[in-house]
Structure formats: C-alpha cells, structure tokens
C-alpha cells in the first residue's frame, strides 16, 4: 500500500488523464486506481526482466575462523531499490511523455483534448527509470536491500543480472 499511496500523491484527479482510460474505468478515480496498480505492479514485479543486481553473501557464522564459507546468491529487483524519490521520478517521466504526446498531436493538427497521462506512460516510465541507471546501486543500498529481505552475512560480490 505504501507505493500506491506515494503514487497517489503525484497522480491526482486534477491532472489530464487519458480519456479512453477514464471512460473504460467509469470515473477519474477508478482510472487513477487502475493506473497506480499497474505502475506499482510493474515496479515491484520479480521477473528476469526486472532483476537489478545479483549479490553473493557469505553467511558463515564466524568469518576468518577457518570455518568454510557458506555462500549464497540473492537476486535483487528494481522494487528492492524503490523509494519515494524514485516513484516521483517515474511520475515526472510519465507526465513529460504525456505532454510530449499532446504537443505532437497539436502539431499534427489533431484534437489533443483526449490525450493525457495513461497507463502506457507510467509503465514506460518505470522501465526507463531503471534502464537509464547504467551503474549498479551503491553497496550500502545493496546491503540495506539484503537486510530488508532478511539476508544476513558479509557481502562478497555484486554483479549485474545475466
């Protein structure tokens, strides 16, 4: 519910929304709820395409005591690194894409009154937010994500997903 609440801070009923989505949903509020659910679902999806980093952790009890290492790998996903700032960036990207689409419609002489923010803008913004970041997340962020996931131990290595 946290991500949906944050999306809801930035996606409000006073924004121009895709008219077809509002009509299909039956109301502006219902359209926003569906858009937010789709964006949050994409942000937190745990699929091969949303893998963001692979961490190898040594969870042996005493490091350096001669005990054999107990190595395990953990895939971290985009959602593991989501924050309020990331969600705001996603919404800002979606807004810019919708504005650009509206300007293109106006330039082409088309009726742009039905053009507004839609699910497609949000889903593309989720994808772009993480694909534009070419570097792996900083080690403290990776350690925090592992801790939140309940993984304990010494971080041995971090690699991009394959």
Q: At which residue positions do the language-model features occur?
A:
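C-terminal engagement/docking regions of AAA+ P-loop ATPases
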Residues: 61-162
């Amino acid at each position: 519910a946290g991500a949906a609440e944050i999306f809801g801070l930035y996606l409000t009923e006073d924004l121009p929304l895709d008219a077809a989505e509002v009509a299909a949903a039956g109301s502006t509020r219902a359209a926003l709820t569906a858009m937010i659910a789709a964006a949050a679902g994409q942000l937190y999806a745990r699929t091969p395409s949303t893998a963001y980093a692979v961490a190898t952790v040594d969870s042996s009890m005493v490091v350096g005591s001669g005990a054999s290492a107990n190595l395990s790998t953990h895939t971290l996903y985009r959602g593991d690194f989501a924050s309020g700032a990331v969600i705001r960036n996603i919404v800002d990207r979606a807004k810019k894409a919708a504005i650009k689409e509206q300007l293109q419609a106006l330039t082409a002489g088309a009726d742009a009154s039905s053009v507004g923010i839609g699910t497609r803008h949000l889903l593309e913004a989720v994808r772009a937010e993480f694909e534009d970041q070419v570097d792996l997340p900083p080690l403290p962020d990776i350690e925090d994500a592992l801790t939140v996931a309940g993984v304990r131990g010494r971080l041995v290595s971090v690699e991009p997903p394959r």
